[in-house]
Amino acid sequence: MIKIENLGFSYGKTPVLKNITLNLEPGKIYGLLGENGVGKTTLLTLVCGLKKAQTGSISCDGIDPYSRKPEFLSQVFYLPDEVAPVPSTAIAWAKSLGPFWPNFKIETFSSAMKDFEMDETMKMHKMSAGQLKKTYISFALACGTSYILMDEPTNGLDIPSKAQFRSAVLKYTRDDSTILISTHQVKDLESMIDSIIILDRKDVLLNASVEEITSKLFFDYGSILRQDALYAEQLPGGFIQVCPNTTGEDSKLNIEALFNAVHNNKELVKAIFNNE
């Protein structure tokens, strides 16, 4: 489990994260959402140990990530938004780096590359940005780590590749892995995540499972604008609306509408989820 308690971090005199408290459980995929500059990437780099918490604490199964202990580093993989090409074939690169992660399986890398319709013998410095991203995603999934942190993994992927990404994550990750994915491409995650975290500047606006969200909020696709809507957006033929779920009705989560509803009604949404 990843436990984050009262986490704070600043760049110079500019605070980015303040009093962030989260518990991320094994076996779940978390979508990390927020506007530009709210600290999503900073949070990922803190969790993987690239940065040190200035206040508060982070614990990954009892280990401080910044301690950089081998038993932690061998169980975490961080995929940044921008990845570097190397003058090597994908398969040679994977074979050379894989041993740093004890659960790495070259067969999984090759299988994931095949699922992405990628040639593993292709030189990485000759790949497009999307091809390079798919190679790194394949490697991340092949490492078999307890923690997988991804920053905008679908950036640069075409539409078929985004579907392949969702399938690959579900196919190749361990059942007990904690997966944290930061993205602005919310529709890319809609069918695969278990929980959603929405960060505001220096605050957590929402941290809830999909089941809890749809039990407390109703996503209405209709032609009549509702008076109790927390957020409404006109679509061809009607509206997508987010309303308090006072009747226990089932509805299909719309992450983009949820994000806007939370940002437009921060205190009200907090009250709904805190049963106030």
Regions from the PLM with identified roles:
Residues 33-35:
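The feature captures the beta-strand-to-loop junction immediately N-terminal to the Walker
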Residues 48:
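Helix-to-loop junction immediately C-terminal to a conserved catalytic motif
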Residues 56-67, 71-72:
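Conserved ABC transporter NBD signature motif
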Residues 78-135:
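ABC-family P-loop ATPase nucleotide-binding domains
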Residues 148-152:
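Catalytic Walker B motif of ABC-type/P-loop ATPase nucleotide-binding domains
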Residues 164-180, 184-243:
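ABC transporter nucleotide-binding domain
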